[in-house]
Amino acid sequence: VGNRTQISQKTVGITGTLQAVDKAGRKSELAYQLSKASSEIKRDMEHILLSNQTASNGTAGSTARTLGGLQAWLNSNFDGGSGSTAGNLGTTARVGGTDRTFTETILKTVIKEVYESGGTPKILMVNPGHKQTVSAFAGIAAQRYMAPSDAPTTIIGAADIYLSDFGSVSVVPNRFMNANNDCNDVAFVLDPEYAAVAFLRPFQTNELAKTGDSEKTQLLCEYTLEVRNQAAHGICADLT
């Protein structure tokens, strides 16, 4: 069982004039642009790692190699709508079914399955909308901190920890879980000990051919999703 590596890269171009003039707040324009490109690549990576993309060897000169995203790996602890099927080993994509409301019962089922499979469910990763849904689960009522009459009070309208029968689960919102990577209708139950980002080539820069007065630099990395045991995680799918 293994995954494929994928390359993510950005190219920045700096003109001689821009590099030579005084720049407020920074010494090197190249360093500044590479820092921005690094942040962009990291966002792209997170988007891909959580996706329903399948692993592929690609074709030399035409089709890029791709890694298998998290949704395409999770199979054992899967709770989906009618007609849905789970992904498998990074080579088979998850197939969506009939959408249904994200309920506490669905979450409890997947947490229990992860625990029974030997995992320790520690993180519930959700999109912003589902974060608000979890905060409204039964048992979480509106509360106020006790405070002196001359001090403001705090209204508690969020749940950051879900105390399950099998331990505390941190509820983590992720803005990169959206329709663009098929994450708008899923929630992940994760054991972080059994998943990681593995690098074949860490972040590195390559000087490219100069075009006129513009110097170009490529920033790239080659990486993959390392799923050490897919049964240590779970997925709630087809959620509204």
Model-derived regions: residue spans:
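Flexible, glycine/threonine- and acidic-rich loop/arm segments that mediate assembly and lattice contacts
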Residues: 1-240
